């Protein structure tokens, strides 16, 4: 007797009874069962075992044998395969292996295939209980946002409030740190960023896209009228019509134009979650369809990636410092923290919320001094106190050179590091001392450049040279955001690492950090970050190969289209037909030297743009170019898949309404980006992994991004390939199972409670301090899998990722770049920024330097506009005559000379365009400098898009599209020259320019 055959027959025979029993006890399952009428055939390939099932709106009739015309066929190669794949629990490694080797096949109507596979999956998942009942009749769910985890309270199908998570006695103990005779323990709460607490308001925004829409003068079978994009109205259409138009257009583009005709574009970030994130569901969709990839530049790491990296490596961190062990080292050893273009109280370490604020208070309590080098007296400076040096924007490198001059002149540098751990110092020293060019980089020399008095520069150099100093650069203290994003960002980042090298980078109390990073959380507990690609199956453009692809078996996906275009140059690609870019690829320092060109040989130019996610008009330099691009006849079809009617959505031909993360299932960990930011959880006081519950049903007819992609793929015959038969909840379970969570908490308990706190590292096994190993000449002892083994020039774990294995004051990698680039030479030289105060005629026309740093109250554009609660914050927008205007901060002297009053409407303009803002007159800026955060979600031109003043607040209309250096795509978009005047009501770019 063939036991396996009998077992398979019994399973197939029992299946209708199992469905019926489940339907009897689960109204949700019964409703799903009643959706379809179809015949499903399950069989072996040779037909020796076969059974078919006739589903009729809830009724099931099952018969032995083959049906003459089934709607769906599930066919197994043999009995062994069938038994393995139908016996719970499902082993996805076996499922994927069988599918890839054609041992199992699903054939028939894609929509019915999806329904049947989900019916089988729901036998288990429809019994899962989620959330916790509250005394007031609400249910408490959890969510993970870009700024941290939330409790979400839902009653009668609506979100009534959100709140931070307060940990209980059931959660692990919190770590304690001892420093200088004191003990410090962080509060047992998850302190999120302000924008996280605004999420409820944007879920119910009046600007939500609730129905599929088509531009009224767009006819996919006739006149498309691209010139009217941005001004035409829209009409509501059904999902079937919308999906039919999009899927047919995808096929038409491929058939008429060939590979590369479809481009897939997205913002830097979107909604949180390992399943729904752009590197996950969207990446899988793009690979499934075949698209020209619009490649991001390292837009928050620019100077570090294109510059600092070449001195010491860390390419897998895009040139930024790691920060391991930095908190304890700083509290115990540091005497001074220099916040150089670093405002962590505004940018929250990117994802870390306000977790680090109390740590900066600890430093203050311990008497650690603070100095702030920033054109703006930032919220961090106001919070921590200390000396403020209001440097002229773009001239930071000059100040850094003068510090090094004093250190050399007065022997205030770490000779041990310079002589034993570095190369090229003599050549660098000759430049600093003026032997190379005849210009000694004295404090007096820098005063003319920076506006910092020579006596203060010299005093800073001496103070720094005699103390143990932590240098905080950018958002998280180790290189991310800040001055690396302006015209001299490459110089600045290179200067910062050379400052650190001269002071003995890695010795006790000397490192990068602003107390945002380096907490003693357990970093070895595995949970995949969003950078690992989620469900994408993409191995090259994500960090999936590191852990995720092995830990969570799923189908590999590959994009067969070799064409890419740099995001910053997408308008030029469309309008001019050509673009050149350089790779964002972290595996080595040299890959960035390799150019790529659009159009790629053998590929079509772009004729269809599929845009996913939130607005980018407020985050990309010279963004008015995009308005012109969207109206080009070269783009035959523009699809926008988004949540709100904002930014680029208004230029689309077809709008597909996506729901928020509160309306779908997902799973994610706070501040865990993994592939793009290894161990960023070390900026948190507690590692928190959350089930992202589907708190409410999608509003209107909106759908999850995953469901939209799946629905399109069904129409292309690729639905089962895209989904692997899984819903978002199924995928979340697979992510859970791939992690270390099952060793500590059951899936059912995790679903109910909604989160898990990873126990902290024991004091005895806390991670080592970053670069200590290098300073002391030991093998590397940090828990990061890079450089890659071949990246070492000495034995594995010995030395840095450079040719010499040492810190290189004159990088060999840049020496090998031939011919030498004058704006990125191997021997770094100070040059004035092209958007600086010495720009000649341009500076006379536009005499104010405008800073546009990362947003404080919104995560990029995600929480801005659209009726968000943060609009009511007086430091974010100002309501004038019923409209919420973006804020530009202007120095008191500049405002007085121009007759501008506090909160008066002003026009900020240059030859690229104009933006109408509300003026905030302040004494926190020096004369000649203005400040306005980037990342407005609203783009509201008063007239023709791209050629009229914007009242939405897109300050990046004014920023230059010029790269920091030739041979890079290093954006210089955080600094520009403008003029500011009282708003006169002009409505065209020509009038504004005049």
Residue positions per predicted region:
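Short acidic-glycine loop/turn motifs at beta-strand connectors
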Residues: 46, 54-59, 153-159, 384, ...
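Long, contiguous, secondary-structure-rich segments that constitute the structural scaffold
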Residues: 182-194, 689-760, 861-994
